[in-house]
Amino acid sequence: MEEGGQQKGITAAFPPPPPFWKKFTPENLERLEKAKREAEPQALSRKWSPEALHALKLAPELRYLVPPELPKEGSYSLFGEAQSLSTQLPSLEEQGIEQLYPSSLTNETAGPSPDHAYYLLKISKSLLLNFLELVGILSINPEQYEPKIEDIRNLFINAHHLLNLYRPHQSRESLITMMEEQLEQAKEEIREMEQTKERVEIYLRELEAEGRNVSPNDEPVQTPESGPHNTKTQTSESQANGEQVLWKLLDKVEES
């Protein structure tokens, strides 16, 4: 099988890291922290910006440890590919790809339209039809496969682009659902606190009623068998009973 005139370069899915990763050693990190302390001994919790770190006149091997400035506009490189900072989804026409559905569906401000599902279904059926046509072409004239492969590729791109138009709407719906769950959880916690408060108030009223039945001026009846020792014993027993009531109250509150 003859190879085409143009050969595509082989690139790794995850390219190796830049060579300066070897500069990120514990010794260099300690030297960088030492340079920060020497510059401002009193500012221990300061957040250094890349511009301020570059102003410290660091050694060449320490400059690799300074993070670059965050890009504010334009694009950045990710695994060798340029990525745009703009969150707006570019249209297929801007990317030089044929668009198979009306441009009215790309209006993100109008929100999702029922037509999205209709055109997604049409694209799915077209994919099945084009696949059957591709099988027929490969069985009759395999050399004529490229146009049909391009049609299938275009259909997949349109389907993915149409699905990506749902991303803003999906994000809003996910945020609404998350906030509703947090609100319901907060309401449930408030209801549990109110129920616990009511139970505690009931227990306190019961204790108050029991305390009113006992007069503070009541003294133990002196009998021939009673004496100072027996009086102290009765007092300690009443205190112990009061403590047991309080502990039972706390146990009931915890169980409920």
Curated annotation (Swiss-Prot):
Q: What is this protein called?
A: Mediator of RNA polymerase II transcription subunit 7
Question: What are the alphabetically sorted keywords of the record?
Answer: Activator, Nucleus, Transcription, Transcription regulation
Spell out the subunit comment: Component of the Mediator complex.
Q: Spell out the InterPro entries in the cross-references.
A: Med7/Med21-like, Mediatior_Med7, Mediatior_Med7_sf
Provenance organism: Coccidioides immitis (strain RS)
Q: Is Transcription tagged as a keyword?
A: yes
Question: What's in the GO CC field?
Answer: core mediator complex; mediator complex
Q: Which family does it belong to?
A: Belongs to the Mediator complex subunit 7 family.
Q: What does this protein do?
A: Component of the Mediator complex, a coactivator involved in the regulated transcription of nearly all RNA polymerase II-dependent genes. Mediator functions as a bridge to convey information from gene-specific regulatory proteins to the basal RNA polymerase II transcription machinery. Mediator is recruited to promoters by direct interactions with regulatory proteins and serves as a scaffold for the assembly of a functional preinitiation complex with RNA polymerase II and the general transcription factors.
Q: Where in the cell is it found?
A: Nucleus
| Residue spans of biased composition, Polar residues class | 223-242
Region annotation Disordered: where it falls in the sequence? 1-20, 208-244
Q: Recall the GO molecular function terms of this protein's record.
A: transcription coregulator activity
Q: Does the keyword Cell membrane apply?
A: no
